[in-house]
Amino acid sequence: MRRDVQKNLLLHGGVLVALFALQFVLPAYHHGNVARIMVLATYAMGYNLLFGYVDLLSLGHAVFFAAGLYGMGIAVSHLGVSAPLGLMIGVLAGGVVGAIIGALALRTEGVAFMIVTLMFAQAGYLIILYFGEITRGDEGFVIQQVDRLFFGGDLSDPFIRYYAAFTVFCISFLSILALLHSPFGKTLIAIRENQERAVMLGYNVMRFKLLAVIFSAALSALAGATYGLLFGYVGASFASVQYSIFPLLWVLLGGAGTALGPLVGVFFMFYLIDISSGMTTAYMLVAGVVLVGLTLFAPQGLMGEIRRRFWRWLP
Amino acid sequence: MSVLVAKGLIRQFNGLRAVDNVTLEIPEQQVRALIGPNGAGKTTLVGLLSGRLACSNGRIDFLGRDITKVPPHKRIAMGMAYTFQITSIFPSLSVHENVAIAARRLCRNEKDTRAVVADALKRVSLAHVANTDAADLSYGHQRLLEIAMGLSQSPRLLILDEPTQGLAEGEVAEFIKLIHDIRQNTTVLLIEHNMDVVMQVADVVTVLNHGQVLFEGTPADVQANIEVQTAYLGGAHVKA
């Protein structure tokens, strides 16, 4: 047991150190990519909390990402609040939207849950388009450089941006690890493993699931708000169904229910498309074939497969 | 005081009355056995008592409180524990973690939890496999693990649904010893097919047939009652 804990510390600490160190060796193009990947991986971790650890498959997480993005964006651009406060408003917006959608969607299960979350996300997307005067609809709006100052640091500067992305990723990653080791996290896993039993051990399963949705939504919103601040753009495409499917793909590829899976999944997918689009215009075909292959030969995702074959101790 | 009082319980499944006007009262510290032929409504009845199924009619009081409309998780939190007829554990988690999930709800911190878990595992003699995955346990040990999960919550009423089903003879003997240990401070409602076990551990036996209480009495009374024997054991087994 103790040795497993050491291995975990070593592996996850090593990953964080490697991410930190990468910025000194990467060329500018990849430097920007990795910053983006870390923010998207935060989004994927939020998704994984619900999908991987509670076994709730949502098809509407874009609405949470967008809640963070627009919560921050509107606060910073229209209401003139500072970037740190805007970030908090974004997270809060995601949590509130998560609480409302969770309370309603959790009345359903399985396929119905997927459809209900998908519908809510579409409703969110249409709301953004409807209030085009504020949101600028499809076009979106740019967050001015003056609004992107975070305690004096200019988030449009690539190095500060990398640090910011790294910090957000670290905080989210360590929070997830801590959560999994807390009684709350262990109860979530118990619910995933055998919900009926968890009920008959006296747990209010609905309450736990709702809290999980709220955490998941808040983390997704954190990623959304951070994305807007770091890359300076807020647009309706981030609320579209595509951005609900992405986290599902990332997590499936990386390994649902593993702590590192989301990061691995985003990295893999990002560079798969990046590299294959450099070689051929039919890059989506390459991506598709690889995805099919992975689902066939590593149905538990990359980290899930590694856990199954080599490292049983992976969280 | 009675731990559990059920009055006029009815559960209707479309045309079938699985439980038909059952009244039941279990005083504190009693071991009550519930027996009856297959399809008599035993599991449905404990489903109503534990809240897994809703009553079509009737009223249930637990520790003096009306719990007829209380959801199952709250009944458990009030001091019921329930073990499933079909083993229901967390297979991919360790034996220790299985019991810890049950215990944690009532413990202040992980240290307390570990102590409670260790104690519960010791009582069912599973301490030596604490770090094994629950899925790797033998069937008999999985049944014991279920009981340990119940015990770790220090319930006021422990409902055991066919705990000896599928156990080897030696394991059944161990189980009987365990019930004698549990009864010191816990009321037990036991659904049981094995008449030897019932005769050895039950204070009072309730016999269900076609969803109704056919007979209630001590194990000796049950054995002597010809009607019960006809219903439960079949005519051929009736001894003079």
Where are these regions (language model features)?
Chain B
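Glycine-rich phosphate-binding loops of nucleotide-dependent enzymes
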Residues: 1-240
